[in-house]
Curated annotation (Swiss-Prot):
<dbReference type="GO" id="GO:0005829">
    <property type="term" value="C:cytosol"/>
</dbReference>
<dbReference type="GO" id="GO:0006419">
    <property type="term" value="P:alanyl-tRNA aminoacylation"/>
</dbReference>
<dbReference type="GO" id="GO:0002161">
    <property type="term" value="F:aminoacyl-tRNA deacylase activity"/>
</dbReference>
<keyword id="KW-0067">ATP-binding</keyword>
<keyword id="KW-0648">Protein biosynthesis</keyword>
<protein>
    <recommendedName>
        <fullName>Alanine--tRNA ligase</fullName>
        <ecNumber>6.1.1.7</ecNumber>
    </recommendedName>
</protein>
<dbReference type="GO" id="GO:0000049">
    <property type="term" value="F:tRNA binding"/>
</dbReference>
<dbReference type="InterPro" id="IPR018164">
    <property type="entry name" value="Ala-tRNA-synth_IIc_N"/>
</dbReference>
<dbReference type="InterPro" id="IPR018165">
    <property type="entry name" value="Ala-tRNA-synth_IIc_core"/>
</dbReference>
<feature type="binding site">
    <location>
        <position position="673"/>
    </location>
    <ligand>
        <name>Zn(2+)</name>
    </ligand>
</feature>
<feature type="binding site">
    <location>
        <position position="571"/>
    </location>
    <ligand>
        <name>Zn(2+)</name>
    </ligand>
</feature>
<dbReference type="InterPro" id="IPR050058">
    <property type="entry name" value="Ala-tRNA_ligase"/>
</dbReference>
<dbReference type="InterPro" id="IPR045864">
    <property type="entry name" value="aa-tRNA-synth_II/BPL/LPL"/>
</dbReference>
<keyword id="KW-0479">Metal-binding</keyword>
<dbReference type="InterPro" id="IPR012947">
    <property type="entry name" value="tRNA_SAD"/>
</dbReference>
<dbReference type="GO" id="GO:0008270">
    <property type="term" value="F:zinc ion binding"/>
</dbReference>
<dbReference type="InterPro" id="IPR003156">
    <property type="entry name" value="DHHA1_dom"/>
</dbReference>
Length: 872
């Protein structure tokens, strides 16, 4: 067997299948395009569904790929096992109605065993097959596989409800008795026992039947066009070919682990407690690729998955003694490992690093206190002999310290404790009720309290300086005022400060505090307004600080200027929106960060591409006009007379600041700005979207980021032009339109065929009328694509007097969907479905005339249908 790098394995895979007439399908973006059924691309075949379902006909029916994929259903197992990953790479070869079993098996065996290719020892390979699939068994024998290496497995049949299905044959590599301490042998395969001896490296799915849950498999009809769908995990192949004990000891992960060793000062022990190394290595791969593909950490959907992965990795970093931000430092290593096939990680390195670092910093503001609090809670449970972490304590970790509930649960379980989910939900509801009665101030300080409310010392923000000397007025540590502090995190108030407190959509400044010797004694990580308006500096204390002492306060000037570019551009954007789409387009929220600006505004429809172009052009014209920016302090009425617009979310006192950009823009604003519009450099809108009824959002970049955005657009256009074989960039649109027109025609034809098929199916279903207890009923299993189709059946049924009651069941994917409709007062559909649903391990409910339920046990569908007569 050849010892190859992961890059060599991937390339050899693609080269082999190219030699067999396959075209190479590039790896798709991890974020699915036009497929709302998927959160992530999760397999090699996921991007080829358009070919397998016939909506698009490939130019070449033979396809091979190496597809980056993400699966997050087993996050908790990552690091605990040898082979669980969130982000992985699936190698595949596919035949769309072309070659079938013979070639798939023969070529697969050739790739694995030929000295020209992988050169696996034949005696180390074992194959499983579906017992009734004698053709696959015979084909393996014809390839030279010993009968003793072929294991029949009843589960080797791929099907998801009705539709294409077929047997599959899996290929395993035997790593020997060293990985089988109890010497169980082939029973590990035959009985599907979890083990580290026989490693599944490849699965070949022979899609040859049209599954029909109403009949035995032996009666499934053959598909007119048979397909091949295979998947081989690159990480597993690399582990086998590199002689690694686990996937993590391969060249795909070890360079990352080595970097973690450097950062932590700890050594990775393949035979010891190495879970944290594995978690970090796995999660930073997923984060790097997902963020590079456009997904960002957030509070829902994909964003929540990324935030959860990042926070889990950070916590495992803490376990290794890494207490500073570190994950972003691993991004270049990920990029270097994958550069040969996925150059985009290094190309987008700066962006990915910044997103990861910012998210780390956000989490780090409270993680120390949160971890300490959790440790105290668990110690208290142990002392009291309890085994469950209470809901109110979970909520405090979640609400005050920012810990994800899943992370709390995982940490508690690691320590041998359970968590009170219901208690957490109750505490969450109480908090939501409180929020309705009073606004709770957010920010890194957590929540308002008496200590903060008691700050009455005066403090003044100085706009026009990046550094100044000031007296320290207030120190708060552990929620108590104190005269001095020498470590940990603290909140500080100075007599005056150059640090801008987060307000009006502009993020807070960061920077340093120095003593009279020029030594840095604290790092400012956040600034929020205290209840009485003073800038409240959240700092990491590095050396002694004491009230009444003078310190030098220095902001991060480069960061401030980047934020000012975006904030000033926001004013220009606001004015341009008024001019292009109307005065109604008023600000509904904004965020001016270092890397981008986000502007929310009221508007009743999506902004057209032409309007966006005009807006972008107008903003840039004002930048190039080099308009002088002036600020004036005056009263509100005078400001209004000057034509100033008030900003969303701001409360104005007697004296307000008016920011004027030439004669183009006049706004009330308490933020910081540039001196001249030309300093912005360039403005580029990167996204426009709806975020709620009547509210739109524009995300834009300025300066260097704007230039990068334009360059990326140009690169993308060049790639599109090359893909559609446009002779020049200007011809790309016409080429794409032609392809789109062709696709639309095919889709229309497909929809018409589906309509006809559904109508025919409905006629057959409604013919089978039964009667029980004087009630006429129809009970049938139907083949539909989604639950909505069941409702369509019911709507058609209502139009005529077919029966009094209709019961339909459909196996859709791994779920069972049940519908009950009733036209008679004697049968309550909602009550009836409550009796039927448990039969298929489900539950549901509804109205007297219509009810639906979902279940998970498709094997009990026939039993459910038989029970209808008893429940009417």
């Amino acid at each position: 067997m050849k010892e190859l790098s992961s890059a060599q394995i991937r390339q050899m895979w693609l080269d082999f299948w190219k030699s067999k007439g396959h075209c190479v399908e590039p790896s798709a973006n991890l974020v699915p395009v036009n497929d709302p059924t998927l959160l992530w691309i999760n397999s090699g075949v996921a991007t080829l569904k358009k070919y397998f379902d016939g909506s698009v006909i490939p130019e070449n029916p033979r396809i091979t790929n190496a597809q980056k994929s993400i699966r997050t259903n087993d996050i908790e197992n990552v690091g605990k096992t040898a082979r669980h990953h969130t982000m992985f790479e699936m190698l595949g070869n596919f035949s769309i109605g072309d070659y079938f079993r013979d070639e798939a098996i023969e070529w697969g065996f050739e790739l694995l065993t030929s000295p020209e290719w992988f050169d696996f020892p034949k005696d180390k390979l074992y194959m499983t097959y579906y017992p009734d699939d004698k053709d696959s068994y015979n084909r393996w024998i014809a390839c030279g596989v010993e009968p003793s290496h072929l294991v029949p497995i009843e589960d080797n049949f791929w099907e998801i409800g009705a539709g294409p299905s077929g047997p599959d044959t899996e290929i395993f590599f035997d790593r020997g008795e060293d990985f089988d301490p109890e010497n169980i042998g082939l029973r590990l395969l035959a009985e599907d026992i979890e083990n580290d001896r026989y490693i599944e490296i490849w699965n070949i799915v022979l899609s040859q039947f049209n599954a029909d849950p109403a009949v035995p498999r032996s009666e499934y009809k053959e598909l007119p066009n048979k397909n091949i769908d295979t998947g081989a995990g690159l990480e597993r192949l690399a582990a086998v070919m590199q002689g690694a004990k686990t996937n993590f000891e391969t060249d795909l992960f070890m360079p990352i682990i080595r970097e973690v060793e450097k950062l932590s000062g700890k050594t990775y022990d393949p035979d010891g407690d190495n879970m944290s190394f594995k978690v970090i290595a796995d999660h930073i791969r997923a984060l790097s690729f997902a963020i590079g593909d456009g997904a960002l950490p957030g509070n829902e959907g994909r964003g929540y998955v990324l935030r959860r992965l990042l926070r889990r990795a950070v916590m495992h970093g803490r376990r290794l003694g890494i207490n500073e931000t570190f994950l972003y430092k691993l991004v270049p290593t990920v990029g270097q490992i994958m550069e040969s096939y996925y150059p985009e990680v290094l190309e987008k390195r700066d962006f990915i690093e910044k997103i990861v670092k910012r998210e780390e910093e956000t989490f780090a503001r409270t993680i120390d206190a949160g971890s300490g609090h959790l440790d105290s809670l668990l110690a208290q449970l142990k002392a009291e002999g309890k085994d469950t972490l209470e809901g109110k304590d979970i909520f405090k970790l979640y609400d005050t310290y920012g810990f994800p509930v899943e992370l709390i649960e995982e940490l508690a379980e690691d320590a041998g404790y359970k968590i009170d989910h219901e208690g957490f939900k109750s505490a969450m509801k109480e908090q939501q009720d409180r929020a309705r009665a009073a606004v709770v101030k957010g920010g890194s300080m957590g929540m308002q309290n008496e200590t903060l409310a008691g700050i009455v010392e005066e403090s003044r923000f100085e706009y026009d300086t990046y550094s100044l000397e000031s007296s320290l007025s207030v120190i708060i540590a552990d929620n108590e005022r104190t005269e001095a502090v020498s470590e940990g995190q603290a909140l500080l108030v100075f007599a005056q400060t150059p640090f801008y407190a987060e307000m009006g959509g502009q993020v807070a400044d960061t920077g340093r505090i120095k003593n009279d010797k020029g030594d840095t004694v604290a790092e400012v990580v956040d600034v929020q307004k205290a209840p009485n308006g003073q800038p409240l500096h959240t700092v990491n204390v590095l050396a002694s600080l004491s009230v009444g002492t003078n310190y030098t306060l220095e902001i991060n000037k480069e960061r401030r200027l980047a934020v000012e570019k975006n904030h000033t551009a926001t004013h220009l954007l606001h004015a341009a929106l008024h001019n292009v789409i109307g005065e109604h387009a008023t600000q509904a929220g904004s965020l001016n960060e270092e890397e981008f600006l986000r502007f929310d505004f009221t508007h009743f429809e999506a902004v057209s591409n032409e309007e966006l172009r005009h807006i972008e052009q107008e903003v840039n014209e004002q930048i190039w006009n080099a308009l002088t920016i002036t600020t004036t302090e005056t009263d509100v009425e005078t400001a209004k007379e000057m034509g100033a617009m008030a900003l969303f979310g701001e409360k104005y006192g007697k004296v307000v600041r008016v920011v004027q950009i030439g004669n183009y823009s006049v706004e009330l604003c308490g933020g910081t700005h540039l001196n001249n519009s030309s300093e912005i450099g360039l403005f580029k809108i990167v996204k426009e979207e709806g975020i709620g009824s009547g509210t739109r959002r524009i995300i834009a970049v300025t300066g260097r980021q704007a230039f990068e955005a334009y360059r990326n657009q140009e690169d993308a256009l060049k790639e599109i032009a090359a893909t559609v074989k446009a002779p020049q960039l200007k011809d790309a649109a016409a080429k794409v339109q032609a392809l789109s027109d062709s696709l639309r025609d095919l889709q229309k034809e497909n929809a018409e065929l589906k309509e006809k098929a559904a109508a025919a199916a409905a006629g057959d279903v409604f013919k089978d009328v039964q009667e029980a207890k004087g009630v006429r009923f129809i009970a049938s299993q139907v083949d539909v694509a989604d639950a909505g189709a069941l409702r369509t059946f019911a709507d058609n049924w209502k139009q005529k007097d077919y029966s009094d009651v209709l019961v339909l069941v459909a196996a859709i994917g791994e779920k069972v969907n049940v519908l009950v409709a009733s036209k008679t007062k004697d049968v309550h559909a909602g009550n009836m479905i409550k009796e039927l649903a448990p039969i298929v391990a489900g539950r549901g409910g509804g109205k007297p005339d219509m009810a639906m339920a979902g279940g998970s046990d498709a094997s009990k569908i026939a039993e459910l249908l038989a029970a209808v007569a008893e429940t009417v």
